[in-house]
Amino acid sequence: MGICLSAQIKAVSPGASPKYMSSEANDSLGSKSSSVSIRTNPRTEGEILQSPNLKSFTFAELKAATRNFRPDSVLGEGGFGSVFKGWIDEQTLTASKPGTGVVIAVKKLNQDGWQGHQEWLAEVNYLGQFSHPNLVKLIGYCLEDEHRLLVYEFMPRGSLENHLFRRGSYFQPLSWTLRLKVALGAAKGLAFLHNAETSVIYRDFKTSNILLDSEYNAKLSDFGLAKDGPTGDKSHVSTRIMGTYGYAAPEYLATGHLTTKSDVYSYGVVLLEVLSGRRAVDKNRPPGEQKLVEWARPLLANKRKLFRVIDNRLQDQYSMEEACKVATLALRCLTFEIKLRPNMNEVVSHLEHIQTLNEAGGRNIDMVQRRMRRRSDSVAINQKPNAGFARQTAVGVIATAYPRPSDSPLFV
């Protein structure tokens, strides 16, 4: 589905990753892939797993909540259909006046779209059974005649994709600290799915499916392609190849064999996008740089070349120790040897350690800047400061824009 449950963005994204062999919809920004017809056999409420956490809405209720699905309520569009902004009462979950109650995002299935009832049903059943801080909350659904709708919590910050790749005043580039926070949150969501009583393979982990709340907490959305993992003595699930080009694990593409380690590979691609600010596939780049993993893989293992991969908008925000650890983790996730890939619990542990380093670095920055402010009181007013300096901290060399006296021997 891949539609942002967030602020209205309709511009087409250049160079976005295409879909392949998939009834999965395009991302919220409308680039198109081949059509898959919707199945027409009868559908009933009996297909939906019982969940006390979900409300069954009538079509009339959602029509009222979205002001009759008015065009100016559209948040995004994709293969599933359109997403509309609406309002409901927090207690009764009935439609409320615009600007009052709880803001919701309503996905309305387009019967001529690329996704159908099975994807809709998977979304209802998985999100209806699961509750986790890093999974988007499904409030309810509507299954009435030909109508298929999903009702979610509203995610005001939009998708990670938009924050990494959009340009303009609406989306500001994410800071290094926020990127680590989002990467960790998404990893926790994926780990939760893999650790379920019957593991769940997400199968379409990508930046457009990672949504951000007002505090930049990451939440996984779009479970239309999710599958139960192998059970008993089975090592994998065999399935038709579906997903998004540039994110799928090579062994899955070659054999159709799906495991939780397939998700780990996809996570590695996203982590590389977070580190580099580049898309997994970008046809607008030079031929040798269009496929991010192929281009970056040899650079990630070389500390002297790693700077070529790191997003230049992150200049002076990170230590080399942090960057190297993120690069090493991405490489491990992207290895061709399935058994050598970490599981998502290990990924979470590594990222928590990196986040601790980042927080320690931030404290050191504050301490050094306080010291420098005290020293600056004794510096002659006519001394001209330079643009910045580098300092050694417990987590490595970190650059800062704090000015330094040009002729002071303390900074040689």
From Swiss-Prot:
Catalysed reactions listed for this entry: L-seryl-[protein] + ATP = O-phospho-L-seryl-[protein] + ADP + H(+); L-threonyl-[protein] + ATP = O-phospho-L-threonyl-[protein] + ADP + H(+)
Residue numbers carrying Phosphothreonine: 58, 239, 244
EC main group: transferase
Catalytic residues as annotated in Swiss-Prot or TrEMBL: 204
Pfam family, one: PK_Tyr_Ser-Thr
Region Disordered, annotated ranges: 15-45
Membrane topology: Lipid-anchor
Protein's GO biological process: defense response; positive regulation of stomatal opening
Biased composition (Polar residues): 23-43
Modified residues (Phosphoserine): 208, 238
Binding residues annotated for ATP, in chain numbering: 75-83, 107
Tissue: Expressed in stomatal guard cells of leaves.
Consequence of gene disruption: No visible phenotype under normal growth conditions. Leaves of well-watered mutant plants have increased relative water content due to decreased stomata opening.
Lipidated positions per record (S-palmitoyl cysteine): 4
Keyword Nucleotide-binding annotated: yes
Protein's name in the database: Probable serine/threonine-protein kinase PBL10
Organism: Arabidopsis thaliana (Mouse-ear cress)
